[in-house]
Amino acid sequence: MSKKYLINLLFLFLLFFCNFLNAAEIQKNRAIILTDIEADPDDTQSLVRLLLYSNQIDLKGLIATTSCWHRDIVNPESIEKVIRAYGKVHANLSKHEAGFPGMDALLKLVKSGIPKYGMLGVGEDKDSEGSDWIIKILEEKDERPLWISVWGGVNTLAQALYKIKNIKSEVEVKNLIAKLRVYTISDQDDSGIWIRNNFPDLFYIVTPGDDYA
């Protein structure tokens, strides 16, 4: 086997490998997190784990919400606290693998949902920084699905969908809904069933809570 052949083979391998890396970068899943952080310790723990893998996904939002355990307050400052701790180890994480977002970039993704429980926070004049942010990201010219990972209540998403349905054409609503992927382990307020009843075509993974069908 000639030296030239080996060099060409190595070049093709490197070219394939670089293309593979570029494709992997392009195909990162977009995700917005809804969290009732401070309801109990688990969401803080989950956020720490998420940031350790934040180079593997394209984070688009970190939204503080209410839930059945956290009915009338949201805590974006607690999300920011975890991000600032992440900022202290960002350089070390980046030594091991590329692509970890910077602290400042993540802080810009922190938003607040309405500090009301469930459907009390859905309807006319119930828009929040968080619900408007979901719409903004959903309207971006990006063909990748937008995953909504729900760790608490889902009324911030419900309000975004309520507004979309009221300001968009039927075709626009259908196209935006088709881009959404919702994953929540259970219902933590009554807005989840409202979403499923009013948007039956929405991709929505859930084990319904005890109080909601």
Label every model-predicted segment.
Residues 1-5:
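Positively charged n-region of N-terminal signal peptides that target proteins for export
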Residues 8-19:
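Bacterial N-terminal signal peptides
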Residues 23-213:
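N-terminal acidic, glycine/proline-rich low-complexity segments
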